Amino acid sequence: MMNHLMLAGTAMIFAISVMGGDAVAKQQSRAITAEMRANALANVERYDWAAEQQSSAIRAARAWVAMDDDELWELITSQELPRDIHTNKELGCPNCGDGIVPYGNYPWTTAGDASKANLRSASIHVEGLIPWKLRCPNCEEVYPKNDFWSYYQSALDEHGFFRRELGDESLLYNEEHPDPDDPLHKLYVDDGYGLTDSDGNRHRFIAYYNSWMQWTNIRRGLDALAHAYSLTSDPVYAHKAAVLIDRIADVYPDMDFEPFHRMGFEHSHWGTGMGRIIGCSWEGGAVQRMAENYDIIFDGMQGNEELVAFISRKAEEHNLGDKSSLEAITGHIAENMLMEFVRGLEDLRIRGRARKALMIVIATALDTPGVSEELIDRIFEPGFPSEADPDGRSLNWLLVECIGRDGIGRECGGYGLSWMRSARQYPALLEKYPEYTRRDLIAEFPKLRQTFLVEPRLMALDAVLPPYGDSGSTGGWGRIGAAATFVEGYRLYRDQRMADLAWRYADGDPARLRPSNAIFLEDPDALPREIAAVAGDEDFRLRCDHLGRYGQLVLQTEEPDAARGRAIWLAFGWALGHRHADALNLGLYAHNIDMLPDLGYPEYTGAWPKRHAWTANTISHNTLVINDVRNRANSGGQISLFACEPPVRVTEVMAPDAYDDIDAYRRTVALVDISDDDSYVLDVFRARGGTNHRLSYHGPAGAATVERLEMIEQPTGTFAGPDVEFAELPGEGETIRNTSGFSYLYDVERSGGPVESYYTVDWQAEDRRGRIAEGRQPHLRLHALTPVDEVALASGDPPQNRAGNPRSLRYLIQSRIGEEMQSQFVTMLEPYDTTPFISEVRLLETEHAAAAETVVAVAVEMIDGTVDILISCEERTRVEVEGGIEFDGRFGMVRIENGDVRLMRMSDASLLRVGDVALEAEQPAWEGVVTAINADDPADHRISLDPPLPPDADVVGRRIHFHNDVPKDTTWVIEAITETGISTGEITIIWDFLDSSDYAAGFRYLVNEDDRFVIPNHFGLDR
């Protein structure tokens, strides 16, 4: 038969023990047992919803059952037929070029009936679709032009494996030009390894089809068949699935992506080139389902003589070894599929977030006493999955280091969510192998609880996940979280908060509270009844929030109405994957749209030029560029002020390491309500050091209107200069990774010189996503208050392969040019509907002893005559403000109506006085040092303080900021006052392991003895 390379080490030892004479062979399905299947059948008889689930499963599997066993067997392609996730992403379609770009990253569909030709359609057995042909969704041209299936069959060896050298080359011709003398006879012909277009460019259509259509279709078929078996106990579904799984076990030992990587084929492999069927980062999730499905159908294979007869016949016909018994077949699957998955983990050809879950599933599917337990033990070891992976990716690592203290993973957006969602699955996975009792995840890993709670905390307005880093789309909108998540969390923890979340996400419908496996339970409504009984009935209110290592904060209005609410968010995370160079990037939601839309996910990841030079660059974000280079966003940031005292919510975040050799890089932002429907934003960006400070903004449209300032059109070039063409990198040593990105800004207008006076820029929002109601006309108006050396407008492009993304956005760049710059950019953002509510904004004169760029006072005059005065100081400062206002602190706000003071707010301050109206405080903040920490109780992390807080200090629910050399944010909500200090409750103060190779050595902490602490106090006065 085949000569498979057997890897040395632990995986080989396990392989021998599984197949050895002392091993107890698998006896039963474990993930979905016979008892669970019986419950499903009973529930089908009792409940309409269960009967519909069964009917749906039967429908999904129908086409697969209709195929004969030989057809199924032939679906599985072998190693030498390449796989690729792109055809040619640089050139697009051979016929229409970049006309295909708006259709997404992976746009090709199966040729044939367009109504059936979705991205990953089954094609071999779906009537109306053409096997091994791809269709451009834009121009509808079909490639390749040859009959690849006939060629494929001619190239099979004795094992039924594809060998290109065996193929009949006479079959490799363009069917539209069958005459050998036709010059187009060989054009657009793909032998599996790509075709050449009329310009000599390579396009990899068959490899794309093999990856996206063929293998994805195989996995979907297995899912459908296994699910149908689990809900019917009909062995016909198990039979068909077993044919596929046995054949996969034939080909899988040879599967290796790296040879194709060396040939230029692409897949998701973190740049390593490694993988098995597909790239290593996606392989784990793909093969996990194969292992799960094998376990599910195992019971249905028992006693199936027809199955044995078929597989035995194919083995004899193709010299595949002895498969004359069910024991031989299941042994073959265990050795050549399940244990090959283990070997893939060992040699790192299987990576990604699913590795530990895959190992548990393999152990469960093997169901071999002793061996299965040892396989599961390995996921807790520092060396997992391999000593060749020096970082280690054990479950301990995931639940202590990778997952942040708030429950989100160490990457941006959807990537961070995937780590979190991966973590949540482990308790349920281990429950499927109850013989394993050596670890208790709920007791050992307190961050696990937070993974069930964090999704609502990540959102703005309970409606949208900010598009942080490589995530989301430009102006996209969408809620995350699901009732099923909170139901599962409640099942594990019996946590009141999770019951409340489940009830809210289910809109109070008990039927939506059924767990995902409800059909397999004896009483599927028991948990929904319990949740309905304990869920709270208090009105839900939004709150301002922040997450530490992830580095995202949200200030928002309290009413949970996305159409009327307003929210801002800031980015300041530390060491996040898929991060952009976006330190202190600002976002704003108002009037049901994204007013400062981040560009979101790039057209492609990897080394895609536009991704690095533009989409992920600093200049494309709403933040400050220094030295005309990108900032070092992943150096982290720290919150120094966080107050939510409606109608004012204010924060300050510092990112001192965003650039080398600077003294300050910090942003103060306040969200101020003027009514139930409108708020404005004060934005103060302070920076000291470096050259050329450029503050970039872009609004929700491709056009912008400037008032009070004349702009001059630059007829040629880009923002990089009139002689620099689009995307050009003219500088010495300039690359896509170090460029300023200025050459990606085009259609430039400039002020022609310094600007000293106040001006505005107005964007009328474009409705790209159907979010603007009839009769509404949202705008964003920016009030610029800072003298600068130049103002420029230019257009920049969002990724063009994301549905709903605009063609371009209009950027405002305010530049202060020079050496050793000291800047205080002061900007007011006014999101409004149809008619502005601000008449004018102006800087007020101030007198104080601090540096000029550390203090600012602004008057905001409303159309109705109301005047707000806002004062922002970098540090606590005594200030006299124009108009007889006295202030001593960091942030203050006064609202004056008809000449009378109506309200005051101040933070980290002791005095705010307007005439005879004063707000005074003896204690602007509590300050001191940390004397001890205690993280022994995962529900009560304690920090001792000197001096300790008075028992009656009004600080519970407020923020405590710790100042130390930890690069990530060290701000916590105070959950309780203790005798010696405070408690952060269940939000841990643990950072990571002291020694990643020895977990018993203990932990590093985010807070330590002698760290300085500050608890700013906040005060208000309403008249």
Positions of predicted regions on the chain:
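Non-catalytic terminal regions with compositionally biased, polar/charged low complexity
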Residues: L812-Q824, E830-R1023
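Beta-strand-rich recognition/accessory modules
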Residues: S757-I863
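Long, low-complexity, polar/charged, intrinsically disordered or flexibly structured peripheral segments
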Residues: S123-N210
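Aromatic-lined, polymer-binding surfaces characteristic
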Residues: Y209-L453, M459
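Bacterial N-terminal signal peptides
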Residues: A8-S17
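Carbohydrate-active enzyme catalytic cores, enriched for enzymes
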Residues: R410, G414-D594, E819, A849-A850, ...
